[in-house]
Amino acid sequence: MYQLEVKRWLVTYRFPPSEGWIVHCDIDAMERANGGQHKPDKAERARIAEASLREMGVKIGPHPLFGRADIVAEHPSHGLFVVEVEGDSSRQKEQALYSALGQLVLQMDGSLHAFMLAVPDEPAWERQFLKISPYARSLLKMTCVLVSANGVRQDIASAGR
């Protein structure tokens, strides 16, 4: 599942604008398969995912405060979530996870926001999440979720908190 597809299903199941969520989603050129080398199906799948986000009412582009965070979702009752999203690409999953963690840490300013990492619901990605200790997750107020076209679930370590 490509990064833009993970964003689509995460918003669909976890942050639906129809339930009062205000969602900003930043999309870069690589996610749209513009520039670089991509699998033949990526551009079309990305186009479908982006169209779905737009149809749901997601604001495409940087967030006014959090800039190029992948997703910023705000709800009057549920608070504000800053989310970094990874998907399948030519990059090693471990390196993608470290990059996403670093991006989240750079967004942390002591505010009472929630932070989330979202990846495809696949065993290889779940194994990467197991590298993040429960202590670190608690300290960072960070949840790790696995996303598919069928729903969103917390990984084993997050669910045990």
Model-inferred region functions:
Residues 67, 100, 128-129:
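Amphipathic coiled-coil/heptad-repeat helices and related helical stalk/stem segments
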Residues 86-89, 121, 160:
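A short beta-strand motif that forms part of the nucleic acid-binding face
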Residues 1-13, 24-35:
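A short, highly charged nucleic-acid-interacting micro-segment common to nuclease
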Residues 21-82, 93-96:
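Active-site metal-binding core of divalent-cation-utilizing nuclease and nuclease-like domains
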Residues 81, 85-111:
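Mg2+/Mn2+-dependent nuclease catalytic core
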Residues 108-151:
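Nucleic-acid nuclease catalytic cores
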Residues 154-161:
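Short, surface-exposed amphipathic charged segments that create phosphate/polyanion-binding patches used
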